[in-house]
Amino acid sequence: MDIKGGRRGNVEDSLNKLSLSPPDNNSSFLSNHFQVRKSYSQAPARTLKPFASEDIKILLLENVNQSALSNLKDEGYQVEFLKTSMSEDDLVEKIKGVHAIGIRSKTRLTRRVLEAADSLIVIGCFCIGTNQVDLDFAAERGIAVFNSPYANSRSVAELVIGYIISLARQVGDRSLELHRGEWNKVSSGCWEIRGKTLGIIGYGHIGSQLSVLAEAMGLHVVYYDILPIMPLGSAKQLSSLPELLHRADFVSLHVPASPETKNMISSKEFAAMKEGSYLINASRGTVVDIPALVDASKSGKIAGAAIDVYPSEPAGNGKDKFVDSLNSWTSELTHCKNIILTPHIGGSTEEAQYNIGIEVSEALTRYINEGNSIGAVNFPEVSLRSLTEADRNAARVLFVHRNVPGVLRQVNELFIDHNIKSQFSDSRGDIAYLVADISDCTPGSLEALHQKLESLPCKINTRLLY
Protein backbone atom coordinates (compact mmCIF):
# COMPACT_ATOMS: atom_id res chain seq x y z
CA MET A 1 0.00 0.00 0.00
CA ASP A 2 1.03 3.61 -0.24
CA ILE A 3 0.52 4.42 3.42
CA LYS A 4 3.57 4.71 5.60
CA GLY A 5 3.65 1.98 8.18
CA GLY A 6 1.60 -0.50 6.12
CA ARG A 7 2.78 -4.04 5.50
CA ARG A 8 5.10 -4.61 2.59
CA GLY A 9 4.29 -7.22 0.00
CA ASN A 10 5.08 -8.31 -3.50
CA VAL A 11 3.89 -5.72 -6.02
CA GLU A 12 3.37 -8.18 -8.86
CA ASP A 13 1.38 -10.56 -6.66
CA SER A 14 -0.86 -7.71 -5.58
CA LEU A 15 -1.48 -6.53 -9.13
CA ASN A 16 -2.31 -10.06 -10.22
CA LYS A 17 -4.96 -10.25 -7.52
CA LEU A 18 -6.98 -7.34 -8.88
CA SER A 19 -10.55 -8.41 -9.61
CA LEU A 20 -14.12 -7.22 -9.43
CA SER A 21 -14.41 -8.64 -5.92
CA PRO A 22 -12.94 -7.09 -2.77
CA PRO A 23 -9.71 -8.80 -1.68
CA ASP A 24 -9.72 -11.07 1.32
CA ASN A 25 -7.74 -10.15 4.41
CA ASN A 26 -4.96 -12.61 3.56
CA SER A 27 -4.15 -11.14 0.15
CA SER A 28 -0.65 -9.93 -0.56
CA PHE A 29 -0.26 -6.19 -0.46
CA LEU A 30 1.56 -3.61 -2.48
CA SER A 31 4.62 -2.07 -0.96
CA ASN A 32 3.93 0.46 1.75
CA HIS A 33 4.08 3.31 -0.75
CA PHE A 34 1.49 1.88 -3.18
CA GLN A 35 -2.28 1.69 -3.29
CA VAL A 36 -4.44 -0.37 -5.61
CA ARG A 37 -7.84 0.78 -6.77
CA LYS A 38 -10.79 -1.62 -6.89
CA SER A 39 -12.58 -1.87 -10.22
CA TYR A 40 -16.34 -1.88 -10.59
CA SER A 41 -17.74 -3.01 -13.92
CA GLN A 42 -20.97 -1.07 -13.47
CA ALA A 43 -19.18 2.32 -13.33
CA PRO A 44 -17.18 3.85 -16.18
CA ALA A 45 -14.87 5.72 -13.80
CA ARG A 46 -12.28 3.85 -11.78
CA THR A 47 -12.09 4.98 -8.17
CA LEU A 48 -8.62 4.96 -6.69
CA LYS A 49 -8.79 3.00 -3.45
CA PRO A 50 -6.38 1.13 -1.20
CA PHE A 51 -5.98 -2.51 -2.12
CA ALA A 52 -6.18 -3.42 1.57
CA SER A 53 -8.12 -0.51 3.01
CA GLU A 54 -8.33 -2.15 6.42
CA ASP A 55 -4.64 -1.33 6.78
CA ILE A 56 -5.44 2.40 6.73
CA LYS A 57 -5.79 3.52 10.32
CA ILE A 58 -8.00 6.50 11.15
CA LEU A 59 -8.40 8.05 14.60
CA LEU A 60 -11.54 10.09 15.31
CA LEU A 61 -11.63 12.16 18.50
CA GLU A 62 -14.11 14.42 20.31
CA ASN A 63 -17.27 12.49 19.47
CA VAL A 64 -17.22 13.30 15.77
CA ASN A 65 -20.66 12.74 14.25
CA GLN A 66 -21.65 9.19 13.36
CA SER A 67 -22.10 10.22 9.72
CA ALA A 68 -18.31 10.50 9.46
CA LEU A 69 -17.75 7.19 11.22
CA SER A 70 -20.16 5.42 8.86
CA ASN A 71 -18.63 7.00 5.76
CA LEU A 72 -15.09 6.02 6.69
CA LYS A 73 -16.02 2.49 7.75
CA ASP A 74 -17.84 2.04 4.45
CA GLU A 75 -14.49 2.66 2.76
CA GLY A 76 -13.09 -0.32 4.65
CA TYR A 77 -10.72 1.73 6.79
CA GLN A 78 -9.74 0.71 10.30
CA VAL A 79 -11.42 3.44 12.38
CA GLU A 80 -10.94 4.07 16.11
CA PHE A 81 -13.59 6.35 17.61
CA LEU A 82 -13.22 8.22 20.91
CA LYS A 83 -15.74 10.59 22.50
CA THR A 84 -13.14 12.80 24.18
CA SER A 85 -10.14 14.86 23.22
CA MET A 86 -6.63 13.84 24.27
CA SER A 87 -3.78 15.60 26.01
CA GLU A 88 -0.62 16.33 24.09
CA ASP A 89 1.32 13.63 25.94
CA ASP A 90 -1.33 10.99 25.26
CA LEU A 91 -1.70 12.01 21.65
CA VAL A 92 2.04 11.79 21.02
CA GLU A 93 1.77 8.06 21.74
CA LYS A 94 -1.65 7.48 20.21
CA ILE A 95 -0.94 9.09 16.85
CA LYS A 96 1.90 6.73 15.93
CA GLY A 97 0.89 4.56 13.00
CA VAL A 98 -2.21 6.67 12.30
CA HIS A 99 -2.71 7.72 8.66
CA ALA A 100 -5.60 10.14 9.16
CA ILE A 101 -6.96 11.90 12.24
CA GLY A 102 -10.28 13.65 12.76
CA ILE A 103 -10.68 16.28 15.49
CA ARG A 104 -12.93 19.14 16.52
CA SER A 105 -11.92 22.31 18.36
CA LYS A 106 -10.46 20.95 21.62
CA THR A 107 -7.65 18.69 20.38
CA ARG A 108 -4.36 20.48 19.74
CA LEU A 109 -2.18 19.10 16.97
CA THR A 110 1.04 20.84 17.92
CA ARG A 111 4.46 20.57 16.33
CA ARG A 112 5.40 17.99 18.96
CA VAL A 113 2.37 15.85 18.14
CA LEU A 114 2.96 16.10 14.39
CA GLU A 115 6.62 15.15 14.81
CA ALA A 116 5.44 11.93 16.45
CA ALA A 117 2.96 11.24 13.64
CA ASP A 118 5.14 8.87 11.66
CA SER A 119 2.41 7.78 9.22
CA LEU A 120 0.05 10.75 9.10
CA ILE A 121 -0.91 12.06 5.65
CA VAL A 122 -4.11 13.99 6.31
CA ILE A 123 -6.01 15.80 9.09
CA GLY A 124 -9.74 16.46 9.19
CA CYS A 125 -11.03 19.32 11.36
CA PHE A 126 -14.74 18.62 11.89
CA CYS A 127 -15.47 22.31 12.44
CA ILE A 128 -14.77 25.65 10.79
CA GLY A 129 -11.66 26.67 12.73
CA THR A 130 -8.21 25.22 12.16
CA ASN A 131 -6.20 27.27 14.66
CA GLN A 132 -5.90 24.14 16.84
CA VAL A 133 -3.52 22.69 14.23
CA ASP A 134 0.02 23.86 13.48
CA LEU A 135 -0.85 24.35 9.81
CA ASP A 136 2.58 25.46 8.62
CA PHE A 137 4.40 22.54 10.19
CA ALA A 138 1.76 20.13 8.92
CA ALA A 139 2.42 21.41 5.39
CA GLU A 140 6.16 21.02 5.91
CA ARG A 141 5.49 17.37 6.74
CA GLY A 142 3.35 16.91 3.63
CA ILE A 143 0.16 16.60 5.70
CA ALA A 144 -2.98 18.14 4.17
CA VAL A 145 -5.57 19.70 6.50
CA PHE A 146 -9.28 19.91 5.67
CA ASN A 147 -12.11 21.63 7.53
CA SER A 148 -15.82 22.33 7.10
CA PRO A 149 -16.25 25.99 6.17
CA TYR A 150 -19.92 25.81 5.19
CA ALA A 151 -21.87 23.10 7.00
CA ASN A 152 -22.65 24.92 10.26
CA SER A 153 -23.27 28.41 8.85
CA ARG A 154 -27.04 28.24 9.26
CA SER A 155 -26.82 26.96 12.83
CA VAL A 156 -24.54 29.80 13.91
CA ALA A 157 -26.66 32.41 12.14
CA GLU A 158 -29.83 31.15 13.84
CA LEU A 159 -28.13 31.23 17.25
CA VAL A 160 -27.13 34.86 16.70
CA ILE A 161 -30.74 35.75 15.90
CA GLY A 162 -31.67 34.12 19.19
CA TYR A 163 -29.02 36.19 20.97
CA ILE A 164 -30.33 39.43 19.44
CA ILE A 165 -33.88 38.83 20.65
CA SER A 166 -32.76 37.55 24.06
CA LEU A 167 -30.48 40.54 24.66
CA ALA A 168 -33.08 43.06 23.57
CA ARG A 169 -35.62 41.55 25.98
CA GLN A 170 -33.12 40.71 28.78
CA VAL A 171 -34.28 37.09 28.63
CA GLY A 172 -31.09 35.74 30.18
CA ASP A 173 -31.37 37.82 33.34
CA ARG A 174 -35.12 37.23 33.73
CA SER A 175 -34.57 33.48 33.42
CA LEU A 176 -31.81 33.44 36.05
CA GLU A 177 -33.98 35.50 38.42
CA LEU A 178 -36.92 33.16 38.08
CA HIS A 179 -34.69 30.13 38.65
CA ARG A 180 -33.82 31.77 41.98
CA GLY A 181 -37.51 32.30 42.77
CA GLU A 182 -37.53 36.03 41.98
CA TRP A 183 -40.44 37.46 39.96
CA ASN A 184 -39.26 40.57 38.10
CA LYS A 185 -41.68 41.60 35.34
CA VAL A 186 -40.20 44.78 33.82
CA SER A 187 -40.24 46.57 30.47
CA SER A 188 -37.57 49.19 31.15
CA GLY A 189 -34.62 48.70 28.80
CA CYS A 190 -36.43 46.02 26.79
CA TRP A 191 -36.94 46.56 23.07
CA GLU A 192 -38.36 45.13 19.89
CA ILE A 193 -35.68 44.40 17.32
CA ARG A 194 -37.76 45.65 14.38
CA GLY A 195 -36.25 48.79 12.94
CA LYS A 196 -32.95 48.43 14.80
CA THR A 197 -29.60 48.21 13.00
CA LEU A 198 -27.44 45.09 12.98
CA GLY A 199 -23.76 45.60 12.17
CA ILE A 200 -22.02 42.46 10.90
CA ILE A 201 -18.23 42.34 11.01
CA GLY A 202 -17.13 39.73 8.47
CA TYR A 203 -19.59 39.11 5.63
CA GLY A 204 -18.64 35.53 4.78
CA HIS A 205 -20.76 32.38 4.83
CA ILE A 206 -22.16 32.98 8.31
CA GLY A 207 -22.32 36.76 8.15
CA SER A 208 -24.23 36.76 4.88
CA GLN A 209 -26.74 34.15 6.09
CA LEU A 210 -27.25 36.15 9.27
CA SER A 211 -27.87 39.20 7.10
CA VAL A 212 -30.77 37.50 5.30
CA LEU A 213 -32.35 36.20 8.51
CA ALA A 214 -32.00 39.57 10.23
CA GLU A 215 -33.71 41.46 7.41
CA ALA A 216 -36.58 38.98 7.56
CA MET A 217 -36.97 39.95 11.24
CA GLY A 218 -37.20 43.65 10.35
CA LEU A 219 -33.62 44.67 11.16
CA HIS A 220 -31.61 47.05 9.01
CA VAL A 221 -28.25 45.47 8.15
CA VAL A 222 -24.87 47.08 7.59
CA TYR A 223 -21.61 45.19 7.36
CA TYR A 224 -17.86 45.69 7.27
CA ASP A 225 -15.41 43.38 5.53
CA ILE A 226 -11.83 43.84 4.40
CA LEU A 227 -12.94 42.75 0.91
CA PRO A 228 -15.62 44.33 -1.26
CA ILE A 229 -18.51 41.85 -1.16
CA MET A 230 -21.83 42.09 -2.95
CA PRO A 231 -24.63 42.40 -0.38
CA LEU A 232 -27.60 40.10 -0.07
CA GLY A 233 -30.98 41.78 0.16
CA SER A 234 -30.87 45.40 1.27
CA ALA A 235 -27.70 45.14 3.38
CA LYS A 236 -25.12 47.90 2.93
CA GLN A 237 -21.35 47.57 3.11
CA LEU A 238 -19.59 50.28 5.12
CA SER A 239 -16.07 51.48 4.43
CA SER A 240 -14.71 51.32 7.97
CA LEU A 241 -15.11 49.51 11.27
CA PRO A 242 -15.57 52.73 13.31
CA GLU A 243 -18.48 53.73 11.07
CA LEU A 244 -20.19 50.40 11.70
CA LEU A 245 -19.64 50.60 15.46
CA HIS A 246 -21.09 54.12 15.51
CA ARG A 247 -24.26 53.12 13.61
CA ALA A 248 -25.14 49.64 14.88
CA ASP A 249 -27.50 48.78 17.72
CA PHE A 250 -26.24 45.18 17.61
CA VAL A 251 -22.67 44.30 16.58
CA SER A 252 -22.03 40.67 15.58
CA LEU A 253 -18.54 39.31 14.90
CA HIS A 254 -17.86 36.70 12.22
CA VAL A 255 -14.11 36.77 11.58
CA PRO A 256 -11.33 34.16 11.79
CA ALA A 257 -8.67 33.98 14.48
CA SER A 258 -5.53 35.70 13.21
CA PRO A 259 -2.94 38.20 14.42
CA GLU A 260 -4.96 40.92 12.65
CA THR A 261 -8.20 40.06 14.49
CA LYS A 262 -6.76 39.50 17.97
CA ASN A 263 -8.53 41.88 20.38
CA MET A 264 -10.03 43.74 17.42
CA ILE A 265 -12.83 44.78 19.79
CA SER A 266 -11.17 46.42 22.79
CA SER A 267 -11.54 49.63 24.82
CA LYS A 268 -11.20 51.91 21.79
CA GLU A 269 -13.87 50.04 19.86
CA PHE A 270 -16.28 49.89 22.82
CA ALA A 271 -15.90 53.66 23.16
CA ALA A 272 -16.90 54.02 19.50
CA MET A 273 -20.08 51.95 19.91
CA LYS A 274 -23.50 53.51 20.44
CA GLU A 275 -24.66 54.04 24.00
CA GLY A 276 -26.80 51.08 25.05
CA SER A 277 -25.77 48.86 22.14
CA TYR A 278 -25.04 45.14 22.25
CA LEU A 279 -22.06 42.97 21.26
CA ILE A 280 -22.26 39.37 20.01
CA ASN A 281 -19.24 37.13 19.47
CA ALA A 282 -19.82 33.68 18.01
CA SER A 283 -16.62 33.66 15.95
CA ARG A 284 -13.31 33.18 17.78
CA GLY A 285 -12.39 33.70 21.41
CA THR A 286 -9.37 35.89 20.73
CA VAL A 287 -11.36 38.53 18.84
CA VAL A 288 -12.81 40.35 21.88
CA ASP A 289 -10.80 41.82 24.75
CA ILE A 290 -12.92 40.42 27.59
CA PRO A 291 -11.65 42.75 30.37
CA ALA A 292 -12.58 45.68 28.11
CA LEU A 293 -16.00 44.10 27.63
CA VAL A 294 -16.45 43.83 31.40
CA ASP A 295 -15.56 47.51 31.79
CA ALA A 296 -17.99 48.51 29.03
CA SER A 297 -20.75 46.49 30.69
CA LYS A 298 -20.16 47.86 34.19
CA SER A 299 -20.02 51.45 32.92
CA GLY A 300 -23.29 51.06 31.04
CA LYS A 301 -21.67 51.80 27.69
CA ILE A 302 -23.18 48.60 26.31
CA ALA A 303 -26.54 47.22 27.39
CA GLY A 304 -25.51 43.60 27.03
CA ALA A 305 -23.47 41.01 25.21
CA ALA A 306 -23.61 37.39 24.08
CA ILE A 307 -20.38 35.41 24.09
CA ASP A 308 -20.06 31.87 22.74
CA VAL A 309 -16.27 31.60 22.40
CA TYR A 310 -13.36 32.33 24.74
CA PRO A 311 -9.56 32.68 24.60
CA SER A 312 -9.19 29.51 26.67
CA GLU A 313 -11.87 26.83 26.75
CA PRO A 314 -12.17 23.62 28.79
CA ALA A 315 -11.07 20.40 27.12
CA GLY A 316 -14.33 18.68 28.07
CA ASN A 317 -17.73 19.07 29.69
CA GLY A 318 -18.31 19.06 33.44
CA LYS A 319 -18.77 21.16 36.55
CA ASP A 320 -16.19 23.70 37.74
CA LYS A 321 -14.65 24.00 34.28
CA PHE A 322 -15.36 27.66 33.48
CA VAL A 323 -13.39 29.21 36.33
CA ASP A 324 -10.76 31.89 36.97
CA SER A 325 -7.94 29.39 36.59
CA LEU A 326 -8.99 29.02 32.95
CA ASN A 327 -9.40 32.75 32.28
CA SER A 328 -8.54 35.24 35.03
CA TRP A 329 -11.59 37.43 34.33
CA THR A 330 -14.21 34.64 34.45
CA SER A 331 -15.81 35.63 37.78
CA GLU A 332 -16.12 39.27 36.76
CA LEU A 333 -17.71 38.33 33.45
CA THR A 334 -20.28 36.00 35.01
CA HIS A 335 -21.46 38.76 37.38
CA CYS A 336 -22.18 41.30 34.63
CA LYS A 337 -25.81 42.12 33.85
CA ASN A 338 -27.46 40.96 30.62
CA ILE A 339 -24.44 38.97 29.51
CA ILE A 340 -25.40 35.69 27.82
CA LEU A 341 -22.64 33.07 28.06
CA THR A 342 -22.81 29.83 26.11
CA PRO A 343 -20.18 27.04 25.84
CA HIS A 344 -19.16 27.30 22.17
CA ILE A 345 -22.42 25.88 20.83
CA GLY A 346 -22.65 27.88 17.61
CA GLY A 347 -22.41 24.80 15.40
CA SER A 348 -23.86 22.38 17.92
CA THR A 349 -27.00 21.22 16.18
CA GLU A 350 -27.80 17.76 14.89
CA GLU A 351 -28.08 19.10 11.34
CA ALA A 352 -24.77 20.94 11.40
CA GLN A 353 -22.82 18.07 12.93
CA TYR A 354 -24.28 15.56 10.48
CA ASN A 355 -23.36 17.75 7.51
CA ILE A 356 -19.89 18.44 8.91
CA GLY A 357 -19.35 14.71 9.31
CA ILE A 358 -20.25 14.10 5.69
CA GLU A 359 -18.26 17.04 4.32
CA VAL A 360 -14.99 16.34 6.12
CA SER A 361 -15.07 12.54 5.83
CA GLU A 362 -15.59 12.84 2.08
CA ALA A 363 -12.64 15.24 1.85
CA LEU A 364 -10.46 12.74 3.75
CA THR A 365 -11.57 9.90 1.49
CA ARG A 366 -10.90 11.87 -1.69
CA TYR A 367 -7.40 12.73 -0.51
CA ILE A 368 -6.55 9.21 0.65
CA ASN A 369 -8.01 7.45 -2.38
CA GLU A 370 -7.36 9.94 -5.18
CA GLY A 371 -4.89 12.54 -3.92
CA ASN A 372 -7.53 15.27 -4.39
CA SER A 373 -6.52 18.24 -2.22
CA ILE A 374 -9.29 20.67 -3.23
CA GLY A 375 -10.44 22.48 -0.09
CA ALA A 376 -7.23 21.95 1.90
CA VAL A 377 -6.48 24.96 4.11
CA ASN A 378 -2.69 24.60 4.26
CA PHE A 379 -1.84 22.83 1.06
CA PRO A 380 -1.76 23.40 -2.71
CA GLU A 381 -5.17 22.55 -4.18
CA VAL A 382 -4.86 19.98 -6.96
CA SER A 383 -7.32 17.61 -8.59
CA LEU A 384 -7.26 15.39 -11.68
CA ARG A 385 -10.17 13.66 -13.38
CA SER A 386 -10.89 10.11 -12.34
CA LEU A 387 -9.18 7.34 -14.25
CA THR A 388 -11.52 5.27 -16.40
CA GLU A 389 -11.94 1.57 -17.08
CA ALA A 390 -9.80 2.05 -20.17
CA ASP A 391 -6.84 3.06 -17.98
CA ARG A 392 -5.91 -0.51 -17.06
CA ASN A 393 -2.17 0.08 -16.85
CA ALA A 394 -2.20 3.60 -15.44
CA ALA A 395 -0.93 4.81 -12.09
CA ARG A 396 -1.30 8.09 -10.24
CA VAL A 397 1.79 9.79 -8.82
CA LEU A 398 1.33 12.06 -5.79
CA PHE A 399 4.50 13.99 -5.03
CA VAL A 400 4.73 16.63 -2.29
CA HIS A 401 7.96 18.58 -2.50
CA ARG A 402 9.69 21.77 -1.56
CA ASN A 403 8.85 24.65 -3.88
CA VAL A 404 12.25 25.13 -5.51
CA PRO A 405 13.28 25.57 -9.17
CA GLY A 406 13.88 22.55 -11.38
CA VAL A 407 11.69 19.97 -9.64
CA LEU A 408 9.25 19.44 -12.52
CA ARG A 409 12.14 18.86 -14.89
CA GLN A 410 13.64 16.28 -12.55
CA VAL A 411 10.32 14.49 -12.05
CA ASN A 412 9.41 14.46 -15.74
CA GLU A 413 12.80 12.99 -16.56
CA LEU A 414 11.87 10.09 -14.29
CA PHE A 415 8.68 9.59 -16.33
CA ILE A 416 10.71 8.93 -19.48
CA ASP A 417 9.54 5.31 -19.76
CA HIS A 418 5.87 6.24 -19.26
CA ASN A 419 3.25 8.18 -21.15
CA ILE A 420 1.99 11.14 -19.11
CA LYS A 421 -1.80 11.06 -19.48
CA SER A 422 -2.44 14.14 -17.35
CA GLN A 423 -0.49 16.27 -14.91
CA PHE A 424 -1.17 19.18 -12.59
CA SER A 425 1.11 21.01 -10.20
CA ASP A 426 0.47 23.85 -7.78
CA SER A 427 2.33 25.51 -4.94
CA ARG A 428 1.50 27.30 -1.73
CA GLY A 429 4.35 29.09 -0.03
CA ASP A 430 7.29 26.75 0.35
CA ILE A 431 5.26 23.62 -0.47
CA ALA A 432 4.37 22.27 -3.91
CA TYR A 433 2.20 19.33 -4.93
CA LEU A 434 2.38 17.40 -8.19
CA VAL A 435 -0.29 14.94 -9.32
CA ALA A 436 0.31 12.99 -12.51
CA ASP A 437 -1.38 10.04 -14.20
CA ILE A 438 1.06 7.88 -16.14
CA SER A 439 0.44 4.81 -18.30
CA ASP A 440 2.49 1.85 -19.52
CA CYS A 441 3.07 0.83 -15.91
CA THR A 442 4.43 -2.49 -14.69
CA PRO A 443 5.11 -3.54 -11.11
CA GLY A 444 8.82 -3.33 -11.69
CA SER A 445 8.71 0.12 -13.27
CA LEU A 446 6.57 1.46 -10.42
CA GLU A 447 8.98 0.14 -7.81
CA ALA A 448 11.87 1.78 -9.63
CA LEU A 449 9.97 5.04 -10.10
CA HIS A 450 9.08 5.20 -6.44
CA GLN A 451 12.68 4.71 -5.38
CA LYS A 452 13.86 7.45 -7.73
CA LEU A 453 11.22 9.92 -6.51
CA GLU A 454 12.13 9.17 -2.91
CA SER A 455 15.78 9.93 -3.66
CA LEU A 456 15.11 13.47 -4.92
CA PRO A 457 16.46 16.01 -2.39
CA CYS A 458 13.33 18.16 -2.70
CA LYS A 459 11.01 15.29 -1.71
CA ILE A 460 8.63 15.66 1.25
CA ASN A 461 6.17 12.85 0.62
CA THR A 462 5.62 10.36 -2.19
CA ARG A 463 2.60 8.17 -2.88
CA LEU A 464 1.71 6.04 -5.89
CA LEU A 465 -1.89 5.01 -6.46
CA TYR A 466 -2.53 2.06 -8.74
UniProtKB/Swiss-Prot annotation:
A Pfam family matched in the record: 2-Hacid_dh
Any one Gene Ontology cellular component term annotated for this protein = cytosol
- Asked if Amino-acid biosynthesis is a keyword of the record, the answer is yes
Presence of the UniProt keyword Phosphoprotein in the record: yes
- Compositionally biased region (Polar residues): 16-26
Ordered alphabetically, the record's keywords are: Amino-acid biosynthesis, NAD, Oxidoreductase, Phosphoprotein, Serine biosynthesis
Database matches in InterPro entries = ACT-like_dom_sf, ACT_dom, D-iso_2-hydroxyacid_DH_PdxB, D-isomer_2_OHA_DH_cat_dom, D-isomer_DH_CS, D-isomer_DH_CS1, D-isomer_DH_NAD-bd, NAD(P)-bd_dom_sf
Comp. bias intervals (Basic and acidic residues): 1-15
Identify which residues the record assigns to the active site. Answer: 284, 313, 344 (proton donor)
UniProt feature coiled coil, ranges: none
Record EC number: 1.1.1.95, 1.1.1.399
- Phosphoserine occurs at 87, 258
Region of interest called Disordered, as start-end residue ranges on this chain: 1-26
- What superkingdom does the record give? Eukaryota
List the catalysed reactions: (2R)-3-phosphoglycerate + NAD(+) = 3-phosphooxypyruvate + NADH + H(+); (R)-2-hydroxyglutarate + NAD(+) = 2-oxoglutarate + NADH + H(+)
Q: List, for all copies, the residue spans of the domain called ACT.
A: 396-466
Function field: Catalyzes the reversible oxidation of 3-phospho-D-glycerate to 3-phosphonooxypyruvate, the first step of the phosphorylated L-serine biosynthesis pathway. Also catalyzes the reversible oxidation of 2-hydroxyglutarate to 2-oxoglutarate.
Query: Which family does this protein fall into?
Result: Belongs to the D-isomer specific 2-hydroxyacid dehydrogenase family.
Family matches, as NCBIfam families = PRK11790.1
Q: What is this protein called?
A: Putative D-3-phosphoglycerate dehydrogenase
